[in-house]
């Protein structure tokens, strides 16, 4: 099975339009267009009844002490963890494309509605739900796609992986609200094929200047 995108070249830097955050011109960050990228797939195995799409960042700091603190950087040797940006299940194998902006156009404070989604699919909670918990203006239930917004002072470039799974059943056995970890557990023994597509992103001005 193959997965690709017209939004950027596999492994390249993700354009800011597909991110939740972008540089603000003053060394920090602000909200961005937050469009879901175009994604398309082919060579779905015979017998596939549904698709699951997961987007995660595996470079998220496990401690927030230095996150977004002026005059400091999040150290590169800090242990990192997964952060789910999109959890989409029960997607029909056809049509074999997700259009740019079809599932997300802009950042929604307190989160987009869910779990019901287009094409009869369901969207899980992404990890901004936990990140913004307790925030007076942003606390909420974040369903669907919300793109990259890494710390603007992280010394690591973050990596984002879109993984598409073809399943043997039409509906994943999860009820109500669900998370990326719960979907990963539910996939066990039900996957016919999988494919990945990735990109990188940083808001650290030092790293951006070095890449020019």
Task: Describe the predicted segments one by one.
Residues 1-212:
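N-terminus-centered regions that define maturation/targeting leaders and the start
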């Amino acid at each position: 099975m193959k997965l690709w995108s017209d939004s950027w070249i596999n492994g390249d830097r993700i354009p800011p339009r597909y991110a939740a955050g972008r540089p603000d011109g003053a060394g920090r960050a602000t909200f961005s267009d937050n469009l879901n990228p175009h994604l398309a797939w082919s060579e779905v195995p015979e017998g596939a009844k549904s698709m699951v799409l997961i987007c995660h960042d595996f470079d998220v700091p496990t401690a927030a002490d230095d996150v977004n603190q002026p005059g400091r950087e999040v150290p590169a040797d800090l242990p990192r963890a997964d952060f789910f940006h999109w959890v989409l299940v029960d997607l029909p194998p056809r049509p074999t494309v997700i259009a740019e902006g079809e599932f997300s156009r802009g950042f929604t404070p307190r989160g987009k509605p869910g779990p019901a989604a287009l094409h009869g699919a369901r969207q899980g909670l992404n990890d901004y739900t936990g990140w913004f918990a307790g925030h007076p203006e942003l606390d909420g239930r974040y369903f669907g796609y919300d793109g990259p917004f890494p710390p603007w002072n992280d010394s690591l470039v973050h990596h984002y992986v879109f993984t598409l799974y073809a399943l043997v059943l039409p509906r994943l056995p999860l009820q109500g609200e669900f998370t990326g970890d719960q979907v990963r557990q539910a996939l066990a023994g039900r996957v016919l094929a999988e494919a990945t597509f990735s990109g990188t992103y940083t808001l650290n001005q030092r790293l951006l200047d070095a890449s020019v």
